[in-house]
């Protein structure tokens, strides 16, 4: 078959950067971030987190082609900040949310195990 190997969907080629940023020359305070080997899951998470930021004027993402697992995220900010700072702030916030979710999940699993152990 002509299908690519599955590992090609998530393994970065040698020397490739996971994230690149290109400033938009036509729109002030705008940049395009390209994230390699990711899909709609990451694109939508980042976009939704960026939209929650008061300094963001526009945040959107797209996948250039369905067979390429790359996400382009376009961001425009107001004059109070720049796109890179907003992305960094959003990533930190998402990281805290994921840590909280993981801790909550582990706590609930332990509670469930303790209840199950009572009946054994």
UniProtKB/Swiss-Prot annotation:
What assembly does the database describe for this protein? Component of the RNA polymerase II (Pol II) complex consisting of 12 subunits.
From the UniProt record, give one GO term of the biological process aspect. transcription by RNA polymerase II
UniProt subcellular location:
Nucleus
> What SUPFAM superfamilies does its record include?
RBP11-like subunits of RNA polymerase
The protein's organism comes out as: Dictyostelium discoideum
Q: Which gene encodes it?
A: polr2j
Q: Where the protein is mainly located, per its record?
A: nucleus
Q: Which family does it belong to?
A: Belongs to the archaeal Rpo11/eukaryotic RPB11/RPC19 RNA polymerase subunit family.
One GO cellular component term: RNA polymerase II, core complex
Q: What is this protein called?
A: DNA-directed RNA polymerase II subunit rpb11
């Amino acid at each position: 078959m002509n299908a690519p190997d599955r590992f090609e969907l998530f393994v970065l080629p040698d020397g490739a950067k996971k994230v690149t940023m290109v400033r938009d020359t036509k729109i002030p305070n705008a940049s395009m971030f390209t994230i390699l080997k990711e899909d709609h899951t990451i694109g939508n998470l980042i976009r939704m987190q960026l939209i929650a930021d008061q300094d963001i004027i526009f945040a959107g993402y797209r996948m250039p082609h369905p067979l390429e697992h790359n996400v382009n995220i376009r961001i425009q900010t107001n004059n109070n900040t720049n796109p890179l700072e907003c992305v960094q702030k959003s990533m930190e916030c998402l990281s805290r949310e994921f840590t909280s979710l993981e801790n909550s999940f582990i706590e609930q699993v332990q509670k469930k195990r303790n209840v199950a152990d009572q009946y054994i």
